UniProtKB/Swiss-Prot annotation:
The record marks R446, S447 as: Cleavage. Residues 25-446 form a propeptide. The gene is Amh. PANTHER family: MUELLERIAN-INHIBITING FACTOR. Expressed in Sertoli cells of fetal testes, and in testes just after birth, but absent in adult testes. In female, AMH is expressed after birth in the granulosa cells of the follicle. It comes from Mus musculus (Mouse). This is Muellerian-inhibiting factor.
Length: 554
C-alpha cells in the first residue's frame, strides 16, 4: 500500500448496551492491534434476534470517526478491507489490491474513494455491513444477504459487494442490481474484488443478487468448482472460506454549488454535545426533564421521537405487586430504599388530568429523620460514583448526572426537595441493574449449569457443533437456554405472558394441585448462519430458530 501507515485503530462494539469488562478489553486489544470485536459466543442473552454492533472508529487523540452498524460480527478480513480502503492513495498498486482495471470507467473506483474519504471523517453517519445469508450456485449464481435493522437502509441507494477472492481470471460481470456491466481484473497482488450495486434492497428483501461471470478469454467458462474457489477465497489462518460482504454506503452529502463563477463554500456545523438527539416535550420540572434525558442516554436513543402519551393498561398493572407508600413516613421510605426492584409511581387522578406535568414536591412538613436523609445522600453518591465508572458510558451521561446531583440535597442541611434525591436514587439503582445485566458474566465464568436459581430467565448455553460433521462454521455457538422457577408474581418481565399461565401461577401460589406445573421454556428464537459441506460443495444457509432470545412460563 502507498502512503503513511494508518495509526492504530480502536473499534468499540456495543449491542444494545453490551459492555466488555476492562480486563477483557485490554487482553483483546493487545492481540488485535487495537481492534476489539465480539464473537458470536460473546453475545449476551439480551441481544436483539440478529446481533447489531455499533462500531466506532477512533484515531489519534481519541478523535471520533464514523460509526458502523454491523449485522452479526465484524470478521478480521472485513475489518482489513475497511482499513485498506482508508489507507489507499489509489495509485497502480492500490488499484491492483482491489482488482480495479486501470482502463475501466465503471463506478467502482469513485465509490471506493468515497468510502475511504468517509471513513476518515468525523460524524454521526452510519455504514451497514451485511453478511451472506444464502448462496445458490445452479442454475445461476445467487447471493442473498442478511436483512438490516428495520428502517435502517430504506434510503440508501448504493452498496459495494466485496469479494475476498482466490485465484481466478479477469472476468466481466453482469447481473440484477449491478450498475451496468463491470470488469474485475485480479492479479497476484489482489486481496479484494469490488462490484457496485445500485438500490441494494433486493439483495436481502427480494430474490437476491443474480450474477453472471464471463472470463475475458474467448470461449472460456468457469465451472462451479472454479467459481467457488474464485469468489470464496481461502483463509489460511483459520482454514475456512471468506464469504462476500455487502457494504451499504451512506447517502452522499450535497456538494456546494458555484455562484457567479466562484465556488461558494459553507462548512458543516461541528457536532456539539447535545443532551438528547431528539427534543423532549417541555416539562414544568427541570429535574424530571433532566432525569428523562439521562435514562434515555443510558438505555439508548429512540429510533423515532414521539410525543404520544401512552395510557397505562390497568389489566397489565394488576399483574404486578402493588402497595400504598406513604412518602411522609420515614419507615416506609426506609423499606423503599432496601428494595432495588423497578418502581412505578402513579399520580392521583386529579394530577393526571393536568395539561402540564406537575412538578415534584415533597411534603413540606414531612418527618424526614436526619439519619434517613443522610442514608439517601450517601447511597446516592455511591450509586452515582459507580455509574460514572461503568465502561462504555455514553459521553452525554456525566454532565446530566452532575446536573441532577446539583438539584438534589446532599445532606440534612442542604436545600432542595428530599424526594428528588429518593427518585434519583431509585432511577440509578434501576439503570445500574440493567447495565450490569447487559454486561453479563465473563467468558471464564460461563457454563451450562450455572444460573439455575432465581426466576425463569434466559441463561447462557454454548453448543458444540463439531459432532455435526456436515457443519464447517461455526464449531461452537451461543444457543442459550431457559432456566429458573415459574412462580407468582412473575419477575422475569417477559411481555409475552398469557392469561392461561397467569391463572396457573396464581393457583400454584395458593397451593392448588396441578397435573402439570408451569415450565420455563423459550418463547422467541433467532436464526444462525451455518456454513456446511454437502456433496463436496460448500454452502451457507441462514437456519431459523437456532438461538433462544426470550423465555417465559407456559
Amino acid at each position: 500500500m502507498q502512503g503513511p501507515h494508518l495509526s492504530p485503530l480502536v473499534l468499540l462494539l456495543a449491542t444494545m448496551g453490551a459492555v466488555l469488562q476492562p480486563e477483557a478489553v485490554e487482553n483483546l486489544a493487545t492481540n488485535t492491534r487495537g481492534l476489539i470485536f465480539l464473537e458470536d459466543e460473546l453475545w449476551p442473552p439480551s441481544s436483539p434476534p440478529e446481533p447489531l454492533c455499533l462500531v466506532t472508529v477512533r484515531g489519534e487523540g481519541n478523535t471520533s470517526r464514523a460509526s458502523l452498524r454491523v449485522v452479526g460480527g465484524l470478521n478480521s478480513y472485513e475489518y482489513a478491507f475497511l482499513e485498506a480502503v482508508q489507507e489507499s492513495r489509489w495509485g497502480p498498486q492500490d488499484l491492483a489490491t482491489f482488482g480495479v482495471c486501470s482502463t475501466d470507467s465503471q463506478a467502482t473506483l469513485p465509490a471506493l474513494q468515497r468510502l475511504g474519504a468517509w471513513l476518515g471523517e468525523t460524524g454521526e453517519q452510519q455504514l451497514l455491513v451485511l453478511h451472506l445469508a444464502e448462496v445458490i450456485w445452479e442454475p445461476e449464481l445467487l447471493l442473498k444477504f442478511q436483512e438490516p435493522p428495520p428502517g435502517g437502509a430504506s434510503r440508501w441507494e448504493q452498496a459495494l459487494l466485496v469479494l475476498y477472492p482466490g485465484p481466478g481470471p479477469q472476468v466481466t460481470v453482469t447481473g440484477t442490481g449491478l450498475r451496468g456491466t463491470q470488469n474485475l481484473c485480479p492479479t497476484r497482488d489482489t486481496r479484494y474484488l469490488v462490484l457496485t450495486v445500485d438500490f441494494p434492497a433486493g439483495a436481502w428483501s427480494g430474490s437476491g443478487l443474480i450474477l453472471t461471470l464471463q472470463p475475458s478469454r474467448e470461449g472460456a467458462t468457469l465451472s462451479i468448482d472454479q467459481l467457488q474457489a474464485f469468489l470464496f477465497g481461502s483463509d489460511s489462518r483459520c482454514f475456512t472460506r471468506m464469504t462476500p460482504t455487502l457494504v451499504v454506503l451512506p447517502p452522499a452529502e450535497p456538494s456546494p454549488q458555484p455562484a457567479h463563477g466562484q465556488l461558494d463554500t459553507m462548512p458543516f456545523p461541528q457536532p456539539g454535545l447535545s443532551l438528547e438527539p431528539e427534543a423532549l416535550p417541555h416539562s414544568a420540572d427541570p429535574f424530571l426533564e433532566t432525569l428523562t434525558r439521562l435514562v434515555r442516554a443510558l438505555r439508548g436513543p429512540l429510533t423515532q421521537a414521539s410525543n404520544t402519551q401512552l395510557a397505562l393498561d390497568p389489566g397489565a398493572l394488576a399483574s404486578f405487586p402493588q402497595g400504598l407508600v406513604n412518602l411522609s413516613d420515614p419507615a416506609a421510605l426506609g423499606r423503599l430504599l432496601d428494595w432495588e426492584e423497578p418502581l412505578l409511581l402513579l399520580l392521583s387522578p386529579a394530577a393526571a388530568t393536568e395539561r402540564e406535568p406537575m412538578p415534584l414536591h415533597g411534603p413540606a412538613s414531612a418527618p424526614w429523620a436526619a439519619g434517613l436523609q443522610r442514608r439517601v445522600a450517601v447511597e446516592l453518591q455511591a450509586a452515582a460514583s459507580e455509574l460514572r465508572d461503568l465502561p462504555g458510558l455514553p459521553p452525554t451521561a456525566p454532565p446530566l448526572l452532575a446536573r441532577l446531583l446539583a438539584l438534589c440535597p446532599n445532606d440534612s442541611r442542604s436545600s432542595g426537595d428530599p424526594l428528588r434525591a429518593l427518585l434519583l436514587l431509585k432511577a440509578l439503582q434501576g439503570l445500574r441493574a440493567e447495565w450490569h445485566g447487559r454486561e453479563g458474566r465473563g467468558r471464564t465464568g460461563r457454563s451450562a449449569g450455572t444460573g439455575t436459581d432465581g426466576p425463569c430467565a434466559l441463561r447462557e448455553l454454548s453448543v458444540d457443533l463439531r459432532a455435526e460433521r456436515s457443519v464447517l462454521i461455526p464449531e461452537t455457538y451461543q444457543a442459550n437456554n431457559c432456566q429458573g422457577a415459574c412462580a407468582w408474581p412473575q419477575s422475569d418481565r417477559n411481555p409475552r405472558y398469557g392469561n392461561h399461565v397467569v391463572l396457573l401461577l396464581k393457583m400454584q401460589a395458593r397451593g392448588a394441585a396441578l397435573g402439570r406445573l408451569p415450565c420455563c421454556v423459550p418463547t422467541a428464537y433467532a436464526g444462525k448462519l451455518l456454513i456446511s459441506l454437502s456433496e463436496e460443495r460448500i454452502s451457507a444457509h441462514h437456519v431459523p430458530n437456532m438461538v433462544a432470545t426470550e423465555c417465559g412460563c407456559v
